[in-house]
Amino acid sequence: MADSKDLKKIEKALGKISQQQEEILTRLERLEAEAPPAESMPREALVSFLDQFRAGEALGEASLGAWIEVSNTACVKGGLRTVQQREGMHARLLEARLKELGAAPTFEVPEAIYDQTMKSAGDCEKSDPEKIAEFVKQFPDVDAAIQPILDIADKLDGDPETQFMLRTIAQDERSTLEFLHDACQLLNG
């Protein structure tokens, strides 16, 4: 059993530890206050990203329209219609945000990529299960596929409007990819 002398030593040691903790917390708070702000994205890089993303989403809307025209699988066609509407909405939102930032949409998907995408999507010789399998093969990991969008959003603490627009678009993209993965599993086993 500890006597009063031992208890006093313990109390003194605990007091010293408590004081050291306070000093450490004070230093941490000072360091956090002095820390440089989180990495931000230069305006030109943001405008370029938004413009290219906008063009890609517009191509997505157009190519999904071509796919819907030749699709003969009801579950695919229904899902593609929803995805097409989201892609178009994203393109319009991104274009509007570009304009709000004082920029104009200028990026165009290279013609060869546009033509190949439209040809592949509208190919009636290729079945829906084949097209979906090809798409899923390009994006096997849903999280990895949307991470670049989230990485950009993480750099936009100074622009919460764009930051949260990108985060909600990423949620839509996750939904699209999950639909395509589920459809691939359903149709291809």
Question: Language model features by range: what are they?
Answer:
Residues A2-G189:
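Non-heme di-metal
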